[in-house]
A protein has these predicted regions:
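Short, small/polar-rich loop/turn modules that mediate ligand/substrate recognition or access, typified
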Residues: 175, 180, 238-240
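Substrate-binding pocket helix/loop in short-chain dehydrogenase/reductase
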Residues: 99-101, 105-113, 207
Length: 253
């Protein structure tokens, strides 16, 4: 039997990149999926591919994570179709990267905060009663940008570190409800990173040299399968943790 047979997993930003890799990993273990994002065509394409390849059901919903009402609608549709929620994965995030802190505007900070920590906050609150029923789990995505203070990432890092703090408190408060809350900090090869590699090959090679394993993570195999573990019974005693999937870069105690 597959580890997540007939589970229901919500993945924000599930139509591309890391989110789609996670979707593939969960589908391979038998979980039905709810994929959210801002581009309908991308979500529909993801649904068709996943259902054809893995034989699971996928509900695609266009939703902006900064819109609380849109998130309420996502959960309403999820319960109407599947009747339960086992895992919530807050993966989506929008931000302006590459700007020094002194060049960030309030609008830049708002963009990161609303699409990041507010989205995670809204989703977690509305999913709580359903996760309590299933003794489910939350997997929130943060970043090495905050953990290691990477230049040019101040608004993004602020949002991601806020998500880590929110997650630790939720792990404490929701433990008695049987809900586990963990954080993943990935360093994965995505579509945008592939473009960056092509446009800046020398900078890419310099970056790779700082990763002891010598590569970026694969979204499905290196990120998605760890998320499957965190959502499964194998991780039943794991909560409040930050899992750094960075290939050894930024080693910390």
């Amino acid at each position: 039997m597959k580890r997540l047979e007939k589970n229901v997993t919500i993945i924000t930003g599930g139509g591309k990149g890391i989110g789609f890799g996670i979707a593939q990993a969960f589908a391979a273990e038998g979980s039905d999926l709810v994929l959210t994002g801002r581009t309908e065509s991308r979500l529909i394409a993801a649904k068709e591919k996943l259902e054809k390849e893995y034989g699971i059901e996928v509900l695609p919903i266009v939703a902006d994570g900064a819109d609380e009402q849109a998130i309420n609608n996502v959960i309403t549709q999820t319960i109407q179709k599947f009747g339960k929620i086992n895992t919530l994965i807050n993966n989506a995030q929008v931000s302006k990267a590459g700007l020094p802190l002194l060049e960030h505007s309030r609008e830049d900070l708002d963009l990161a905060i609303f699409s990041g920590i507010y989205a995670a906050f809204f989703y977690m609150k509305v999913c709580h009663p359903y996760l309590k029923k299933t003794k489910g789990s939350v997997i929130n995505f943060a970043s090495g940008a905050g953990l290691f203070g990477r230049a040019g990432q101040s608004s993004y890092a602020a949002a991601k570190e806020g998500i880590r703090g929110l997650s630790r408190v939720a792990a404490t408060e929701w433990g008695p409800d049987g809900i586990r809350v963990n954080v993943v900090c990935p360093l994965a090869m995505t579509e945008s990173l592939k473009e960056w590699k092509e446009n800046y090959p020398e900078l890419y090679e310099k970056t790779i040299q700082g990763i002891p394993l010598g590569r970026f993570a694969d979204p499905k195999n290196d990120i998605g399968r760890v998320c499957v573990f965190l959502a499964s019974e194998d991780a039943s005693f794991v909560t409040g943790e930050t899992i750094t999937l960075q290939g050894g870069s930024g080693l910390r105690p």
